[in-house]
Amino acid sequence: MKTNGLFKMWGLFLVLIALVFSACSDSHKEKKDALEVIKQRGVLKVGVFSDKPPFGSVDSKGKYQGYDVVIAKRMALDLLGDENKIEFIPVEASARVEFLKANKVDIIMANFTHTKEREKVVDFAKPYMKVALGVISKDGVIKNIEELKDKELIVNKGTTADFYFTKNYPNIKLLKFEQNTETFLALLNNKATALAHDNTLLLAWAKQHHEFKLGITSLGDKDVIAPAIKKGNPKLLEWLNNEMDSLISSDFLKEAYQETLAPVYGDEIKPEEIIFE
């Protein structure tokens, strides 16, 4: 009886040891930097917008197009040797952080504005674009914040515009939507008086909807847009920072601008107003 008891205890001990080693092994796997994971996988997973031309959208053939997309494909080329070794994953503004935390994407390239609040939850690489908030309305009737009193303002959930007006102007009623298509459709259908978003996007949209104008072209701080990754991946962050330096010094950002943004903005906007040189 005693012998059987000893065998049982010894068996239990071995099981516990196996569990400990398994846990240690899993912990080691979890600590592997995202850069190593991407190289082993052979595919770069990038979160982009699917409804925000000319930065990230899907064309009639189901292909992703836009400024963010072109830069992301160059990242895949420089990291994995082939710009096609990339998987674009559509993401809404309010889900960008969660997609990183859940490892659904390696990098967010969805017009993500670098803010102090977001720094607490994700790591930003060096920026590739300049941006500020703008407000668009029919005929540009809204020319200052005071004119929004007792009126509704459209914003996208989880965007800089959402945070800015919620924090600084809590008395302005916000009409919030997840998707950019919903946001602009609401403005076209007169669901609210005006819409607040990145001025770069509003300028592009106004080019196709001439009855709408930016009455407020720049609001609040001038910000930057940068690639974002999940915290705790220093090797990937270092690689991204070096990559951004390279894309700027080689004039690749200028080339991407000419390919995707210049046809939209024309001569009204100078490249240096938007991109880093």
Residue ranges and their predicted role:
Residues 50, 129-139, 199, 203-245, ...:
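Periplasmic-binding protein-like
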Residues 26-29, 39, 163-177, 213-218, ...:
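Ligand-binding clefts/hinges and TM-proximal coupling segments of bilobed small-molecule sensing domains
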Residues 95, 112-120, 164-167, 181, ...:
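A ligand-binding cleft/hinge motif common to bilobed small-molecule-binding domains
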Residues 31-33, 86-98, 140, 175-185, ...:
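Short helix-initiation/N-cap motifs at beta->coil->alpha
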Residues 73, 77, 85-147, 214, ...:
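Acidic, polar ligand-binding/catalytic clefts
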Residues 29-109:
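Extracytoplasmic small-molecule ligand-binding "clamshell" domains
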Residues 25-29, 70, 74-78, 151, ...:
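Extended ligand-binding regions for polar small-molecule ligands
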Residues 20-23:
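C-terminal motif of bacterial Sec signal peptides marking the signal peptidase cleavage site
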